[in-house]
């Protein structure tokens, strides 16, 4: 069975990678779908994020990385995918994700959303936190894959925030 794990992944963190690996133990195929979020100001372009994720996940079988503009359910319907994977870190994540799952189900009745609880050691990590700490010169190497740490350093040297 195929599932999609969508997100802005700006940038991908070790928490995301953990969810991806755990989802792969449940599903035969997983599409990591890089999406736009108009409410977020992204440091990396969609294509940069896609490339970074492909580098980070290159040793995993059963993973495809794709990019999508627009409604998530449109992508799912187009590709015949009926399962959505989401990670939950805290109660605040649950409230938002429940609302999104119900809205997506209304738009695509065949869709099921599977929630994976974040592993405790990654439960505090978010892409926003990673960017903020990196911006102020903090060490984020325990929160992101090495490829991402390098890309963050390069972006910050360019002055892109």
Swiss-Prot record:
Pfam family, one: CTP_transf_like
Annotated EC: 2.7.7.3
Cofactor(s) it depends on: Mg(2+)
Keyword Oxidoreductase in annotation: no
Residues the record lists as binding substrate: 8, 36-40, 72, 86, 132
SUPFAM superfamilies: Nucleotidylyl transferase
Top-level enzyme category: transferase
Name of the protein in its database record: Phosphopantetheine adenylyltransferase
Gene label: coaD
